[in-house]
């Protein structure tokens, strides 16, 4: 990271804690590594991101429905999915610092450094060599590349590395009252399997026809050996996933459709298009025949925020094999080639999967601005979160200009009329300018000030967050003004 991007990232983290967005979990006990809590404004922002995704994915599609599956699943589920045997990362230790790293991430950081230095040929060559080693699971070759490119441990500065080894990422625990009789169960490492084992339940109970999708938002858990970069990589995190079931042979068409649709969802929030890019996977997961990531340019480089995968029929076929239950769908549609119904088959699956915590961080970074408002007369600045109004934790703040003359009572009256429909904050402490600054810092789109004129003609002053412009409006219009400002139509139309 350059000094400016490094500073931006540190400032966002500091801001998140200071203003109640994200806290270190169990902080009074010195915290727990890579585990975070969302504060009063963070939980609101997170819920608004979830609502935006759910509306775009479920409410706007007649053939997509939602479920909420359990975190604990039968342990055979994870054997069938391949997670017990194949869910691991290539790790390498530095013998001097005793720190552990993902070998591929060390190499990716080096590739990014070559790119920034203009050494494109070197970057492309290393990328190709790393991809080849990952595809063939050649762990010794990964170590060779680390040594060849003189990659040093960022802590010790030495190149005294162990061999590369694979580490399984699943958390296991026991279910049962007596330890020796207890069954081993896992905290789910992804939410997708809860959808797959329920796909026929949903299809039959909802009379769904192919193509159709099942969406879910939920917690997942991975025993990340290397957890870093704030909430980018955590051991407990939240996913927003949709599995779309299609007729075999149509998966390429649907894959391209969802790839395009999902990027549009991100761009609708107003993020500059150049901040995003597609990244094609060279090493495909055991279940996929095509995979792209939508990556965002974080201060520390491009990182995945959403994956679009063509999972073929792998998961459903595996669950059919391990459970002994038929996972086939009967398709009554007539095949033009044979003039007969398509009949029984196991559907192919297109997956879209977002890391909600990464989406949260992306949103904070995009919105965070430090503005210099100095004039010749005085020095001034403000920190503002220019969040999309639909995502803002607080939709409006209501201030009485002073704490007397009936102004607080009138402000409360206006708040009571609006709070059923909007998340509001009431503030009467400090000068009006300081109150504006506090609301800017949490991303509140408008502030409504009640003054003595309000008592005369029922008008209030609205101050807009981004422009800081003020206008006088009738208090009776506030419900419509706020409703138009934060309507989901602004994002979903």
Task: Identify the residue ranges that each predicted region occupies.
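NTP/phosphate- and nucleic-acid-binding module
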Residues: 1-493
